[in-house]
Amino acid sequence: MKIGIDISQLTHQGTGVEKYLKNLVTTLLKTDKENDYILFFSSLRRKLDYSFINKLTGSRVEIKIFHFPPLLLDFIWNRIHVFPIEYLIGNVDIFISSDWTQPPTLKAKKATILYDLIVYKYPEETHNKFSFNPIKLLVSPNIVESQKRRLFWVKNEVDLVFCISQATKEDAKKILGIEGQKLKVIYP
């Protein structure tokens, strides 16, 4: 079986999202000796930590690196929800997304990681305005709206949601209305 995993969030070193994703990928690759893995990475400016990746590479692991801006992927996958992930990484049986986007798939089953629902519970604590700095050529997205778009697709299309805590699982049931059998708690 081929399993694809979005590892783009590994660029956010020192965050809980990065630590959880790194532990999940490391554990899967150390314990699973049967399946092949395709790791998808995309970032316009940030670089992948190759010291971590070099420890994971082997005959069963392939890394696909792209340099798409996160706003483009948000538009393509969260807003208009086109361009299946298989067009970039090839055929996979399962695709695990992480924190920023929820791509469609052609045939692959979908799983995702749900860290929290702060965009619903405390939107004022999250960046909730779109801004552009023409001097630095920096675009700062509205994280609240982007996450809500992603979570719409999570609720309606994803087959399995890995929650990082029991509280996140309960929030997913209560706030998003996701059925309990689709939710699995995997602690950090």
Question: Where do the protein language model's features map onto the residues?
Answer:
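Carbohydrate transferase catalytic cores enriched for Leloir-type hexosyltransferases
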Residues: M1-P188
